[in-house]
Amino acid sequence: LADASCDLLASVFSPLDWAEARRLLAPGGGLLRMGPTHEHLWDLRERLYDEVREYDDEKHLALIPDGMHLAHSETLTYRLQLDDAQARSDLLAMTPHGWRASAERRAAVIDAPLAVRVAIRYDWIERD
């Protein structure tokens, strides 16, 4: 894609190449970045790991390059009840936690009902 050829970019739960985003965005264009907060799937992580690590929900903001700025941010939070074993298996399959945790811990999650908190941060970042 050509420099400054995009009015909108989106990064959803994925690593972001900030320099490439800046290169692609047209002046006044925006980047929608969606990522987990420290609360996201906390209940699942407690079942999978001996120690659940905290992290800073705003750490990525320090990576915003010159020529771009955070224009708006919101967090969406809700509880999700997973009573069905297939739903719990699907959740594990779509998160990195399902790959990192032991087979024993994954099986224990699949075998028992689980309520999880979904917590997603939405950032709107604009190109100057």
Segments from the language model and where they lie:
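Short, catalytically relevant binding-site loops at active-site mouths
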Residues: 15-18, 37-41
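Conserved beta-strand signature within the Rossmann-like core of class I S-adenosyl-L-methionine
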Residues: 28-40
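A short acidic, Gly/Pro-enriched loop at the edge of an enzyme's catalytic core
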Residues: 1-8
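Short His-Asn-centered micro-motif
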Residues: 10-14, 33-34
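A short, conserved alpha-helix within the catalytic core of class I
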Residues: 13-25
